[in-house]
Amino acid sequence: GWFADNWLPIIQGKRLHKVRAKETIMCVGALEQQAVFRNNDLPGIMLSSAAQRLIHLYGVRPGTTAVVLAGNNDGYGTALDLIDAGVNVRAVVELRQQPQYDEVARAVIDKGIPIETGSAVYEALAAPGKNHLGSVEVRKIAGEGRCEDNGVTLQCDLLCVAVGYTPTYQLVCQAGGKLSYDDDSAMFTLTDLPDAYQIAGSINGLWNLDAVRADARRAALIACNAIGTVHQEVPAAVAARDGNSPNFSWPIFPHPQGKEFVDFDEDLQIDDIINATRDGYEHVQLVKRYSTCGMGPSQGRHSALATARLVASATQKTIAQTGVTTARPPFAPERLGHSAGRSFYPQRRSNIHYRHIEAGAQMLQAGAWDRPAYYGPPELRQDCINAEVNHVRNKVGIVDVSTLGGIDVRGPDAGEFLNRFYTFGFV
């Protein structure tokens, strides 16, 4: 999480580092979002980035026969990765009516993979006798969230979904940044960043690799100039987008029989979100608490955007007005062992600590502070305490309570104010 004054607890392996940063650069990327359709929770349905991770990081072929649901050009990269891994790609179901193909998309077309433009997966069907994806029903899109009455069924045991992203906004919002929504790109964006705080890369709405690198270099120069390690001119901001957004505006397709899951953690369907608004819980914060959407292990990472879209539609508000629920620390689960930390505490000493030592004080731990317990050798502890008590009682004593803090009382009636609750008179 992020805490006041750029205090960042960072977990690395078994250790928690407590970092107080002068400047912070967040390059935490974006979170891929799911499409919402009937039976979208069947095993065999996964995000395109999940399929790519299985292939490239773990060397696992995620299926044998695949369909790719694409609302952006990233889906075509996934299709090529699947082909290279030995998966038979039946088709790319393209949500966009008129997609702008890049080189990767054209490479998929050149391989003879059918592209079903302006279409959606309306329903996923389990294989007979199995609780696993067996086929998908593909229909033409008739309008926002609506499909035509008839379609075609494609046999497959793998469906890869690439319909958009949302920035990993949690830490930035904890620091005071604001989350807005850009209707043109159908994406959440981050604005009003606090001082000493930079973002770069896909969290900043950049997707091209060269643009991401340039943005990171710019953020680093701003931070390094601020702390004085370099003195270089900062280049102009990288163009935020090239007009080809990775987000499809409405990958949500209700089905009369339900089971179109918005939040997989809490088994929440489209109707659960809509009914919450009909019951009077129209604010997205209340929708969360009434429906428990976003309260599971993923903490809304994969449901916040779809929920905001549904709540906005149901309440006749914009998605920017609807927003998302408050992101609070911790961002990721932390073990009790991390919180326990090492068995030591900071040593705090008053301004006259060493004068106490010169006077023969034996120190004790009072909270976080070293304070004198008594003056004299430990073997004469009780005698020393008795002598100090007698001295203070019969003569005078001075005690240093600066370690306890203080209250600054000002004003013409300050003295009378103190007189009224202290056991002695100040004035």
PLM-predicted stretches and their roles:
Residues 1-349:
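Residues forming the flavin
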